[in-house]
Amino acid sequence: MHPLLFLAGLCLGVASAAPQLYQSLDARWSQWKATHGKLYGMDEVWRRAVWERNMKMIEQHNREHSQGKHTFTMAMNAFGDMTNEEFRQVMNGLKIQKRKKWKVFQAPFFVEIPSSVDWREKGYVTPVKDQGYCLCCWAFSATGALEGQMFRKTGKLVSLSEQNLVDCSQTEGNEGYSGGLIDDAFQYVKDNGGLDSEESYPYHAQGDSCKYRPENSVANVTDYWDIPSKENELMITLAAVGPISAAIDASLDTFRFYKEGIYYDPSCSSEDVDHGVLVVGYGADGTETENKKYWIIKNSWGTDWGMDGYIKMAKDRDNHCGIASLASFPTV
């Protein structure tokens, strides 16, 4: 074939492929907006550009996963039109400070440690919730641990009110929908003498005046305990007492768009944590020598995120993402 004919054919092929590519992106963009109820004004061009960059990043990661370079996959979700900075500003609301001198839990030596634990199977865990665009992760982490301890005591699983914590725990140091600390949430319930149910005091993803009503209280805290910042201590305590509140680094895009598999990203910090979650179990895929051990983490970003709202996070890999750095639980 003549070289000029070959080049002409190549150019024609590229030109014809480009409209198909953009048509495909147009369809996916429209479908994504419809799925997540997104409506834009003047900023749609910018949001579309951000979404496309995130989509390309996700697809590149998944190609590398298929080549064995990663242990987890990613997927587009409701956060796709946000930059990383925007996402962190509206979703990761844990206010970090030096740990107060509180009681440190010493796990009993006589506890038999099973090879795997999943407190969901024992009835300790309420369905996955959605914090919305509110810096309220700390409240969801705290209610999750308290829900588990109340179930352990009473045999009844009752969903507790995050809104009660968001609206009422400022005296203990929290900042409502602008962020807070898990231990300060426990301190509020202890000081207040109770916490209302989710049914009586529903969540609406923004701050309001305190509307706590003692007659609707269904939980109390007698004390709370910090766990030494070691994964083995976290494992022993989790197996012994039930779901544990924890703080992690959730700032990376790989976490934001996590879909399934064991989450391990070398860039995830073990010290700079910014998001409250609930540890509900641990286990392993395959043999423990293959770096396939994981923590089972309940998030508060709805069931469309991750594995129906959960994530498997790498376990025993140098406190990956800070999973053991700020773990605690209440007693009731």
From Swiss-Prot:
Binding-site positions, Zn(2+) 4: 208
Cellular component GO terms, alphabetical: apical plasma membrane; chromaffin granule; extracellular space; lysosome
Subcellular location: Lysosome; Apical cell membrane; Cytoplasmic vesicle, Secretory vesicle, Chromaffin granule; Secreted, Extracellular space
Superkingdom in the source lineage: Eukaryota
SS bonds (residue pairs): 168-210, 268-321
InterPro entries, per the entry: Papain-like_cys_pep_sf (IPR038765), Pept_asp_AS (IPR025661), Pept_his_AS (IPR025660), Peptidase_C1A (IPR013128), Peptidase_C1A_C (IPR000668), Peptidase_C1A_papain-like (IPR039417), Prot_inhib_I29 (IPR013201)
Keyword tRNA processing carried by entry: no
Regulation: Inhibited by the propeptide produced by autocleavage. Long isoform of CD74/Ii chain stabilizes the conformation of mature CTSL by binding to its active site and serving as a chaperone to help maintain a pool of mature enzyme in endocytic compartments and extracellular space of APCs. IFNG enhances the conversion into the CTSL mature and active form. Inhibited by CST6. Inhibited by the glycopeptide antibiotic teicoplanin. Inhibited by amantadine.
Annotated active site: 137, 275, 299
Site for Cleavage, residues: 105-107, 111-113
Binding site for Zn(2+) 3: 183, 226
Post-translational modification: During export along the endocytic pathway, pro-CTSL undergoes several proteolytic cleavages to generate the CTSL single-chain and two-chain mature forms, composed of a heavy chain linked to a light chain by disulfide bonds. Autocleavage; produces the single-chain CTSL after cleavage of the propeptide. The cleavage can be intermolecular.
Principal place of residence: other
Alphabetic keyword roster: Cell membrane, Cytoplasmic vesicle, Disulfide bond, Glycoprotein, Hydrolase, Lysosome, Membrane, Metal-binding, Protease, Secreted, Signal, Thiol protease, Zinc
Induction: By progesterone.
Pfam families xref list: Inhibitor_I29 (PF08246), Peptidase_C1 (PF00112)
Family: Belongs to the peptidase C1 family.
Assembly with partners or alone: Dimer of a heavy and a light chain linked by disulfide bonds. Interacts with Long isoform of CD74/Ii chain; the interaction stabilizes the conformation of mature CTSL.
Protein name per Swiss-Prot or TrEMBL: Procathepsin L
Organism field: Felis catus (Cat)
